[in-house]
């Protein structure tokens, strides 16, 4: 039995797209470890407002980040419909709370457009670019930019 393996062309990259509110974002799929359903987190004292707390992921403590709040959007009110994207950020693994995962995209660097100058400083800080695919506008998030070196070490 043979399995078809899709290989990427030189310059292609795979991204995982997800929704937060009415907006669509994406991250490099190579950073994503797994996608799991929402699990209530245990709050941690003196943590940033965007950190919901921690969960037990197969014996490991996983910090859960409200990605909406971290991006300067209205904080999420997690429900069973939300999902956690477990991702590698620098040398740490974190959980990113999003509304839903929508797609896996294969794109070339040429379709990634620069973030407009009129965007907020916060948006430009985290956004690597914008993808216009069909009638969708998808913001490419740079996960490493979400956390300073010290925050990443603390996570």
UniProtKB/Swiss-Prot annotation:
InterPro entries for the chain: CheW, CheW-like_dom_sf, CheW-lke_dom
Protein name (Swiss-Prot/TrEMBL): Probable chemotaxis protein CheW
Keywords: Chemotaxis, Cytoplasm
Record's subcellular location: Cytoplasm
CDD domains: CheW
GO cellular component: cytosol
Domain CheW-like: 12-152
Entry keyword annotation includes Cytoplasm: yes
Top-level taxon: Bacteria
Function: May be involved in the transmission of sensory signals.
Presence of the UniProt keyword Transferase in the record: no
Gene3D superfamilies: CheA-289, Domain 4 (2.40.50.180), SH3 Domains (2.30.30.40)
Chief location: cytoplasm
Gene name for this UniProt entry: cheW
GO-annotated biological processes: chemotaxis; signal transduction
Organism, as annotated: Rhizobium etli (strain ATCC 51251 / DSM 11541 / JCM 21823 / NBRC 15573 / CFN 42)
